[in-house]
Each structure stands twice: as structure tokens, then as C-alpha cells.
Amino acid sequence: VLQPGYPLLDDLQLWHIPADGDLRMLRSGDHLPLADRPVMVRNPWLPVQLEPGINQFLLRVDTTSTVSLPLHLVSWSTSASQQERLMLFNGSFYGVVFGLFFYNLFLFLSLRESSYFWYLVYNINMLLFIASFDGTLWLFGGPGGMLQSSIIYMLMFSHCIVATQFSRHFLHTATEFPQLERLLRAKMAIMAVFLVSLPVIGLHAYNTLASLAVLVSSIILLASGIHVWRSGFRYGSFYTLAWGLLLVSLIISTLNSLGLLVNVSAGTLWIKLGVSCELVLLSLGLADRIRALREERQQADEKALQAQLERDAQNRFLARMSHEIRTPLNGVMGMLQLLRDTPLNERQRHYLDTVNGPA
């Protein structure tokens, strides 16, 4: 079986010219429904049967996406062995993503924290993008044709928007970094315009623009995380490390697609590994930030309780002092009242009036 390792190729036509000259043609690609492909898998595989003698093959590729064409000609037994390992990796990836989604969904329902909501939206968007990028999404049916190709690029633009919105809440830019907040808001507005620009600029330009948008967006968000981290906020370290790992995986995948690395077939695997690490680190960062907020709230409550205890102690002290002062003073005033009722000469009465005067 001839295995093209890139599932986003629109249309592949393979002509097989065996030694007897009997021309045969096979067709596959993501524009064909799964039931119409020669092999019903997410990649556009083409089964071939080698006849004795010289076999010639002509392959024509027509696609609107990046032309990445890693080819492997393997036996069915070797292919089955490779698919076992690949299914294990893909199952682990989707298991991690779904596990993080439901874990953070539980936290969102418990805490009602907006950052968790936007993490869930980001998780879903990233899941749909990866599933469409590696062809898994279309195993369950797809529109086919140009619409299916454009959906992938729409998900790339929505990724830029949702990632920025999540970053605003995660990094607290509205309250801590007003200038960065304005930059991220402007970035979201620009990405929203790009998202709806397909009818104006066409699919080819839309494809190029989506790739550039993801690259520029990732760099801006990484720089934002570094700025927050350097400003002394601990959660910025989780954010920076998460986006750094994602960028490294994207760079490795790009180098693979350009043929600059030896293992040219592992590009999608690197992206999945980077996305998994990013989502895990962002989830840890959210948990750390919530824990830090709870510690700050607990410290504030302890300070408020301490201040209340000090006020209560001061009030008790004043009440005790007032009681201790008023008790002998009341005795003195009573004696003065008794003296007023006794016969006094003029001088004694003057002294008594002098004492009673301030009272």
C-alpha cells in the first residue's frame, strides 16, 4: 500500500503502469467521502499490487493546502503494525485532552471562575483543529470539497481569537496590564476580520493568512507571558512554558514538512505532543493561580479577623478603664452631695461649688 502521510491533500490520482501495459488508476483525497476511498482510513492510502517485471507509477496531487507529501510503500502487515503504535499514541492524546476537559469542567461548575470557562472553549477549539488536521474528524463524515478545506483554516483563526480571550483572563491583563489588554483586544478584532475574509480574498490567500496569523498570534502570546512572568506573577511562568513548548512543536513540525529533519513523517505527532503539554501546563497554571488567590483571600480574612480582635480588645479595655474611673468618681460625687446637705460656712460652700462646677 502506498501511504501518503499528510491527510489534508485534496485529490490524489495514482496511475499504475505494470509490465503488461494495462493502465490502472486509483483516486483518493480528503475531498472524497470516506466510503469512496480505496482504503477507508483518515490518510489517503492507495493500495497497489506489484506485478512481475517493471512497474511504473505516476502520482498527481491537487490540493489547496500545504503540499506536504511524505510517501511510504509498505506491506499490509507492516502497515498494520505501524497503525497499532499510532492508534495507541492518538488514543493517549485524545484521552488526555478529554480528561483535561472534564476535569476543568468540574472545576468551572464548582468555582464559577471565568478563566476555566475560556479554558474549556480553548480546549474544544484545539481538539477540533487537531482532529481536522490529522483527518480524524472526517472519519465521522464531512462536507467534502472546498468547505471542508476552509473549515480547517477557520478553526485556525478561531484558535487565535479564543487563545487570546483565554490569555486575557488567565494573565489578568484588564486589571494588572492595561496596555497589554488593549493590544490583545486589538489582536482579537483583527483576527475576527480575517476570519470572515474568505469570500473576499479566496481560499489560497486565506490558507496563507491563517498560517501567518497562527504564527504571529503565538509569538505575541508568548511575549505576553514572558512580560507577566518578569513582572513577578508566578502564573506567568506556567503560561510561558506552555506556549514555548507549543511553539517548539510547531517549529519541529514545520522543519519536518520542509524535509530539514530526518523523520519527516512525525510532524503531526509533534504537534499533538506539544498541544498535550500545553493543555496540561495551562491547567496546572489555572490551579496554581486559584490556589494563590485562595491564599491571598485567606491572608486577608486573617488580617481582618486580627483587626477585629484588636478592636474588641481595645473596646474592652476602654470599658474597663471607664468602669474603674467612674466607680471612685461616683463615690466622691455622692460624698459631695452629702456635704451639700450639711451646715457649711461660706468658705466651705465656695470650695464645694468649685468642685461641683466642672462636673
Residue spans of the language-model regions?
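Primarily the dimerization/phosphotransfer
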Residues: Q299-D341, H350-A359
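Soluble non-transmembrane domains of integral membrane proteins
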Residues: V1-L88
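Carboxylate/His-rich catalytic cores and anion/metal-binding grooves
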Residues: D11, F117, L128-F129
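Juxtamembrane interface at the cytosolic side of transmembrane helices
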Residues: F101-N123
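First transmembrane helix
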Residues: E84-F108, S211-H227
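Interfacial "cap-and-anchor" motif at the non-cytosolic start of specific transmembrane alpha-helices
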Residues: L128-H169, T173-K303
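Residue-level marker of regulatory loop/turn positions in helix-turn-helix DNA-binding domains and
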Residues: F233, E310, L344
